[in-house]
């Protein structure tokens, strides 16, 4: 029986059965980071969402059949401004932030994409597409800039499903007396005086650099061709970024539909307000790493809500994710778990537009099953289902011992445990209690055994 994967398509505003153009060559493009600042956890939601989508598509079509491209934007005005502010070179800044992004993705358990192109390495492709747009009268040169003529693009508002006036309400538009229309956007901009040489490139229109939107059109075309299956990104990219990508790509290649399925993840909020660098209410992934919050906890938090819904970041949500993982790891402790086929109900939850809240509930039900099982065989089956399902969504990649003792100085604790045993041996109950309480303050629980030994675990 053929697997049916239903995925919400922003373009049609409905859930559609995912049917790639070629089942042996499934193509997926996701907008990656602009590497000027350490990614905040809101940026990283996109990384986790599309990592899960990648895993599902691989499960259906096979790893060799799927090509996943996620770009790095390493040419941008924000990069120039921040490098100047920090007093570092462009390359120093972009290299440092790119490495931090990779560490963040590893921390969150994300698989590597098939290809990770950098914008600066594809300037020639961008120039070629811009030249096509000029030749087809979809772009024009004005005041040393190259602009895309928005009114020349058929169905420009299709993705956002709003009229042109509504789309541009509240959106900053760079005004220029030389533009044909106020909404026209930059494909190529000239270099400014005293700008870093490695942020500008030779072109038929003089020294300059590309606009943001043309970068993704060029890199997707280079690695996936005129048409591909999935384009992903945050909901904030629907307009103007993805709208402009569609317009310029379809106009450059008139027979192209560009991406068939458009997938967008919701915002991360803090106290109900969108998390963003401009608002200053953001928390970087590095902040969470420095607090020794395990990556699996953050990943489960990001998967706890449906990917299209807003998700509010708060300490309680992180604590709840930690408690859930503790419960799952406790359920498989001291059980000989084995990988089994993915349970049908679990897989069906993910095949229904990546319904991760239901998937998490199903794993919780298996954990409950372990604790109420009447036979060892039943316990083992439930525990095996837990680890199989959790592994599939990128969780529970440690042993229970590693999980519960992560970040713990075992040598230090064992020394205190032995010191307490000596105190008990000499009936120094006061010292024994002091050591127990000291460890309890450090969230280490001692359990005295009938044979006189003591075992410990992290709370």
UniProtKB/Swiss-Prot annotation:
GO biological process: cysteinyl-tRNA aminoacylation
Cofactor(s) this protein cannot do without: Zn(2+)
Record keywords, A-Z: Aminoacyl-tRNA synthetase, ATP-binding, Cytoplasm, Ligase, Metal-binding, Nucleotide-binding, Protein biosynthesis, Zinc
Subunit structure: Monomer.
Any GO CC annotation of this UniProt entry: cytosol
Localization terms from the record: Cytoplasm
Catalytic activity: tRNA(Cys) + L-cysteine + ATP = L-cysteinyl-tRNA(Cys) + AMP + diphosphate
Family affiliation: Belongs to the class-I aminoacyl-tRNA synthetase family.
Protein name: Cysteine--tRNA ligase
Motif ('HIGH' region): 33-43
Pfam families per the UniProt record, alphabetical: tRNA-synt_1e (PF01406)
Textual note on the cofactor: Binds 1 zinc ion per subunit.
SMART domains: DALR_2
Chain positions recorded as ATP binding sites: 277
Example GO molecular function: zinc ion binding
InterPro entries from the UniProt entry: Cys-tRNA-ligase, Cys-tRNA-synt_Ia_DALR, Cys-tRNA/MSH_ligase, Rossmann-like_a/b/a_fold, tRNA-synt_1_cat_dom, tRNAsynth_Ia_anticodon-bd
PANTHER family: CYSTEINE--TRNA LIGASE, CYTOPLASMIC, CYSTEINYL-TRNA SYNTHETASE
Motif 'KMSKS' region: positions: 274-278
Positions of Zn(2+) binding: 31, 216, 241, 245
Source species of the chain: Rickettsia rickettsii (strain Sheila Smith)
Principal place of residence: cytoplasm
EC number: 6.1.1.16
């Amino acid at each position: 029986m053929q697997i049916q994967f239903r995925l919400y398509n922003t373009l049609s505003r409905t859930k559609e059965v995912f049917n790639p153009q070629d089942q042996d060559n499934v193509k997926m493009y996701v907008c990656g980071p602009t590497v000027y600042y350490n990614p905040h956890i809101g940026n990283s939601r996109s990384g986790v969402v599309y990592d899960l989508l990648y895993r599902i598509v691989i499960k259906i079509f096979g790893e060799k059949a799927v090509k996943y491209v996620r770009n790095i934007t390493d040419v941008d005005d924000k990069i120039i401004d921040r490098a100047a502010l920090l007093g570092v070179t462009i390359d120093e800044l972009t290299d440092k932030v790119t490495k931090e992004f990779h560490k963040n993705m590893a921390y969150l358990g994300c698989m590597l994409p098939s290809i990770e192109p950098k914008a600066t390495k594809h300037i020639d492709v961008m120039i070629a597409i811009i030249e096509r747009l000029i030749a087809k009268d979809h772009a024009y040169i004005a005041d040393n800039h190259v602009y895309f003529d928005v009114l020349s693009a058929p169905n420009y508002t299709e993705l956002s499903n709003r009229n042109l006036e509504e789309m541009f309400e509240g959106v900053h538009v760079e005004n220029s007396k030389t533009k044909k229309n106020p909404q026209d956007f930059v494909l190529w901009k000239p270099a400014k005086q005293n700008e870093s040489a490695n942020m500008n490139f030779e072109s038929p229109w003089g020294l300059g650099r590309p606009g943001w939107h043309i970068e993704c059109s060029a890199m997707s075309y280079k690695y996936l061709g005129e048409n591909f299956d999935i384009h992903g990104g945050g909901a904030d990219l629907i307009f103007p970024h993805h709208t402009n990508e569609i317009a310029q790509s379809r106009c450059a290649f008139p027979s192209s539909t560009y991406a068939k399925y458009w997938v967008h993840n919701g915002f991360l909020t803090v106290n109900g307000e969108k998390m963003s660098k401009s608002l200053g209410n953001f928390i970087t992934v590095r902040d969470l790493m420095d607090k020794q919050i395990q990556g699996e906890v953050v990943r489960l938090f990001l998967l706890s809500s449906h990917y299209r819904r807003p998700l509010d970041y708060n300490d309680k949500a992180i604590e709840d994710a930690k408690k859930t993982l503790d419960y799952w790891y406790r359920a498989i402790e001291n059980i000989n778990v084995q990988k089994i086929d993915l349970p049908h109900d679990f897989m069906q939850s993910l095949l229904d537009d990546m319904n991760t809240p239901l998937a998490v509930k199903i794993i919780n039900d298996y954990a409950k099953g372990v604790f109420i099982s009447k036979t060892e065989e039943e316990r083992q089956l439930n525990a095996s289902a837990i680890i199989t399902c959790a592994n599939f969504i990128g969780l529970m990649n440690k042993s229970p011992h590693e999980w519960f003792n992560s970040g713990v100085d075992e040598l230090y604790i064992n020394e205190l445990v032995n010191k307490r045993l000596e105190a008990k041996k000499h009936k120094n109950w006061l010292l024994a209690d002091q050591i127990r309480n000291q460890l309890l303050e450090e969230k280490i629980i001692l359990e005295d055994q009938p044979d006189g030994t003591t075992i410990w675990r992290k709370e």
